[in-house]
């Protein structure tokens, strides 16, 4: 969408950057000068206690002296709401009382589609929640009771239940006047190849709304109650609203909690996030049925400098952690990394918290390992280096790993740390 000359300048002039930013931060009034529009606060983009985030209201720019985030009011809305440029402009234009320039027919059609799909998704959230509260949801309520999730927690996360019926949601939505094609486009129903009546995608499942950073339901995750179900967990397909590789479960509340100093945690699934949040670890997120992607990593780093990935300490958990390490290495920048909190084997966060309490989970987080430790473990554990050839093979593998780090300074520091670990393994006399 093209914007006419002067529109963005007019938009920026109508809005106070401190007013927009002030909804996301707590100003340090001792350090700030309100009269001059010179404001300071703890940064909303990374975890800190000091006020290193500076807003110059007169110039209309912000800059963080800690993580180096910078930009204007549009950039701020883009980053804090996790939206694109045009959507950020639309948000601010509504606030400023400025009509958006006329869209092309195609742009208007896409915007109307997204708006309509959000309405369908929110109607589905309400339907699923009613089903959980009714007779059909008895088994689902029992499961949630066994998992220790009380009514307040269910309300907080909007959890519902999809009845074990092919057309329960379909009949409800079409009966309420929703266009059949919209239900299919939202990923809530599947249209048969033979042209018959579409049927509900989610059946006999506990339903977890997946919301974007602005709190809008854009997808669902469903947990099967039937132990013999083909898929224990089922996510919405990708739609005009939902790109699973660019979204994280619980992203909105987690971003807010991380901005208040809570450690940003990356768990494996919905129930892990909910268990962590209910235990007071409010800045918890999870990927959506896939391994962590580059886009998700960049999103995590916009929230915190060093997110902690919490995984099972068994072999599968270690393999998953190493896949994240391999993905992250080429993307690393100074000050941006990951740590890994490996839980006791066979335990997920919910198991650990219920068995040993919140303090046990906190100890696991406090012992989180840096990426280089996992790399070293992968290359050395279970190996015997009793010959020059085996040691040379290790050196070759480590050089290959180091070459994937693009940042020269980080590559040098990783090399120094690996050299230190190598000396500890082989003795100071080795070269």
Model-derived features with residue positions:
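N-terminal structured subdomain of primase-like DNA metabolism proteins
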Residues: 1-108, 163-164, 170, 420
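Conserved phosphate/pyrophosphate-binding and hydrolysis machinery centered on Walker-type P-loop NTPases
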Residues: 11-14, 33-36, 107-118, 134-138, ...
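Phosphate-handling DNA/RNA-contact segment within nucleic-acid enzymes
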Residues: 3, 15, 21, 34, ...
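A charged alpha-helical hairpin associated with nucleic-acid processing machineries
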Residues: 212-213, 255-264, 291-307, 311-431
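Structured, non-catalytic alpha/beta "coupling" segments that mediate domain-domain communication
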Residues: 9, 13, 79-96, 204-224, ...
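Terminal peptide-recognition signature
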Residues: 43, 64, 77, 144, ...
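Conserved active-site segments centered on acidic
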Residues: 87-142
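A general alpha-helix detector
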Residues: 20, 72-76, 123-127, 139-143, ...
């Amino acid at each position: 969408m093209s914007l006419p000359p002067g529109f963005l300048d007019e938009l920026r002039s109508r809005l106070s950057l401190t007013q927009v930013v002030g909804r996301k931060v707590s100003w340090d009034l001792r350090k700030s000068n309100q009269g001059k529009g010179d404001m300071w606060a703890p940064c909303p983009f990374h975890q800190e206690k000091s006020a290193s985030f500076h807003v110059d209201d007169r110039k209309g720019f912000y800059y963080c002296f800690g993580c180096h985030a910078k930009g204007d009011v549009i950039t701020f809305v883009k980053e804090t709401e996790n939206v694109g440029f045009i959507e950020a402009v639309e948000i601010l234009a509504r606030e400023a009382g400025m009509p958006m320039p006329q869209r092309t027919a195609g742009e208007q059609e896409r915007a109307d589609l997204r708006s309509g799909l959000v309405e369908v998704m929110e109607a589905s959230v309400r339907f699923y929640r009613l089903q959980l509260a009714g007779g059909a949801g008895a088994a689902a309520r029992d499961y949630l009771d066994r998992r220790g999730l009380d009514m307040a927690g269910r309300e907080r996360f909007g959890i519902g239940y999809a009845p074990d019926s092919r057309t329960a949601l379909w009949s409800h939505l079409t009966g309420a006047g929703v266009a059949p094609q919209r239900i299919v486009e939202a990923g809530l129903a599947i249209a048969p190849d033979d042209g018959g009546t579409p049927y509900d995608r989610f059946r006999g499942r506990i339903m977890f709304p997946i919301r974007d950073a602005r709190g809008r339901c854009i997808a669902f995750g469903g947990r099967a109650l039937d132990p013999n179900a083909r898929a224990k967990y089922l996510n919405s397909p990708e739609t005009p609203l939902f790109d699973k590789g660019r979204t994280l479960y619980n992203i909105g509340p987690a971003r807010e909690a991380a901005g208040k100093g809570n450690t940003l945690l990356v768990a494996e699934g919905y129930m892990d996030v909910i268990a962590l949040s209910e235990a007071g670890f409010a800045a918890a997120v999870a990927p959506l049925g896939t391994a962590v992607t580059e886009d998700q990593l960049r999103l995590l780093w916009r929230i915190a400098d060093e997110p902690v990935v919490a995984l099972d300490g068994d072999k599968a958990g270690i393999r998953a952690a190493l896949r994240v390490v391999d993905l992250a290495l080429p993307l690393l920048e100074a000050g941006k990394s990951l740590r890994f909190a490996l839980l006791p084997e066979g335990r997920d966060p919910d198991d650990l918290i219920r068995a040993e309490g919140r303090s046990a989970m906190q100890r696991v987080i406090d012992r989180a390992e840096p990426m280089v430790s996992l790399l070293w473990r992968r290359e050395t554990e279970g190996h015997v280096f009793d010959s020059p050839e085996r040691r040379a093979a290790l050196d070759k593998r480590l050089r290959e790993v180091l070459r994937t780090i693009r940042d020269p300074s980080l590559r040098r520091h990783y090399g120094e740390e690996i050299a230190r670990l190598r000396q500890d393994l082989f003795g100071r006399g080795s070269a």
